[in-house]
Amino acid sequence: MSTYKVTYSAYAKGSSTVASEGTMTINAESAYMAEQTLKAIFAGLEVIIRYTNNA
């Protein structure tokens, strides 16, 4: 398992209102899984992944 830092913005669906943005550190098997984990955390919001890298 590796540690990834995922930079993201989460918006209310159908809106330009930012609900959350920042960088989250996630332990996962791959960068893709780290991004999917972050999207699951913010289920119900539109999540844009800005950048993902190994921490």
Language-model regions, residue ranges each:
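Acidic interaction surfaces
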Residues: 14, 18, 31, 54-55
